[in-house]
């Protein structure tokens, strides 16, 4: 018997925006940015660490716009899926020709309705974005950062002028991926009051959580789950933080008050990545271990070296 595995890279990024893992209010906000006439322009930052769904997110959000009534263009290192009605420009650093910043500037000068940039490789690209006609053009800018706040800081620093950067900002979407528990073998358990307290979950409202299994009972004997091959997980979903940047937030950006901006994002009432992940754990979609994995503080290289020296 011969088995063959066929992998189509395009399928990996071919998802609708309402199937990314966005919570309902998050999807509604992004959809409003794409469809409401009064919110035509501005920069929306799309943030995710490497290999955490940034391309899938950008493709899905682009497809919320009507490609037949809008001039939509993208600048990418590689086209991972052909998007109907969208002009996808491939920029290759190994080829002779204009650099990324120049390609960005010339694209923005053609008055497109929507432009998506796969990366922010240099400060000149950021400055070209900030100096373009952002009242008429929507720019989706992909950044390799691990939080909504960090993506705003990265963009503002690259522009070099907080007032100019803040003026054009519309919103930010941050994403991290968690693994989805296998529905065939996940194991329910009752969390302790102490555990719920540490997670910030209300006692009495969360009856059970789930953890990975990997095995199922067949005739009262444990066997490896045939669905997930014993891994305990099957697939991935996104946990998002979606925030609108209004007058208050823009003023805080101009002042460089990052703690104030963090507080303003919390007060806005939209779920953060951590809150989104916890909701998915309560819903039985993922495990607390996955929530901890994506929300635990990342150790910097300098701190790692320091700890090794001390050890």
For each feature predicted by the language model, list its residue ranges:
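Short, flexible helix-loop junctions that flank or precede catalytic/ligand sites
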Residues: 1-311
């Amino acid at each position: 018997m011969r088995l063959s595995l066929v992998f189509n890279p395009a399928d990996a990024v071919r998802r609708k925006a309402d199937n990314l893992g966005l919570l309902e209010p998050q999807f509604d906000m992004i959809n409003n940015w794409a469809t409401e006439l009064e919110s035509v322009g501005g920069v929306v930052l799309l943030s995710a660490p490497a290999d955490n769904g940034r391309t899938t997110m950008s493709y899905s959000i682009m497809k919320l716009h009507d490609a037949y009534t809008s001039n939509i263009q993208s600048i990418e290192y590689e086209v991972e899926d052909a998007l109907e009605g969208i002009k996808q420009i491939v920029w290759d650093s190994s080829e002779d020709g204009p650099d990324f910043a120049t390609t960005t500037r010339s694209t923005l000068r053609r008055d497109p309705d929507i432009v998506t940039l796969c990366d922010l490789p240099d400060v000149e690209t950021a400055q070209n974005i900030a100096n373009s006609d952002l009242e008429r053009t929507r720019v989706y800018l992909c950044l390799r950062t691990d939080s909504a706040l960090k993506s705003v800081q990265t963009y503002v620093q690259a522009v070099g002028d907080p007032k100019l950067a803040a003026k054009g900002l519309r919103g930010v979407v941050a994403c991290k991926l968690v693994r989805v528990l296998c529905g065939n073998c996940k194991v329910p358990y009752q969390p302790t009051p102490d555990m719920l307290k540490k997670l910030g979950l209300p006692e009495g409202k969360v009856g059970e959580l789930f953890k990975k299994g990997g095995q199922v009972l067949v005739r009262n004997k444990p066997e490896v789950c045939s669905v997930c091959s014993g891994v305990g997980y099957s697939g991935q979903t996104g946990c998002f933080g979606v925030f609108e940047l209004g007058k208050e937030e823009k003023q805080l950006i101009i002042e460089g008050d990052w703690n104030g901006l963090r507080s303003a994002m919390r007060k806005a009432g939209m779920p953060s990545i951590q809150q989104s992940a916890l909701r998915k754990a309560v819903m039985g979609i993922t495990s607390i271990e996955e929530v901890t994995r994506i929300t635990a503080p990342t150790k910097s290289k300098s701190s790692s070296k320091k700890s090794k020296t001390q050890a």
